[in-house]
Amino acid sequence: MRLVMKFGGTSVGDIDAIRKVVAIIKESRDAGNEIAVVVSAMTRVTDQIIAEAERIVTCTDRKVLDTFMADLRTRHITTLEAVAPDYIDEVTKHIDIRLERLKNILVAVHNLRELTPRSRDYIISFGEKLSVFNPGRYQEVA
């Protein structure tokens, strides 16, 4: 049977939750199912990204952005190390590319002093884009 499994933010919110997701996927795969996995952003990541985008518009110290980006990276890499250490190099590249893109758009928002609906929507999408590992990796880890 072909299945699509969608896991929301709390399902991928922390290390223990992700391990449960992997177990669910493994059980279904071991039962002979073909699986497509869709994951949301980790718990509160989207909210944090939105808050940072809104704050950066009027922020006078861009170092705040660097701190936010470092914290966001640490959270994702720490989770990755605990859940899928064999994929750390590959997935870290995936995360770093997306973080660089996010930082670039946030710098543009800061420089323009404007957060348009279009840029806000684009920024919001990074919560999912930063999900700890590429959904295709769940099957390999499981």
Protein language model regions, located:
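Nucleotide/pyrophosphate-binding catalytic subdomain
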Residues: 1-142
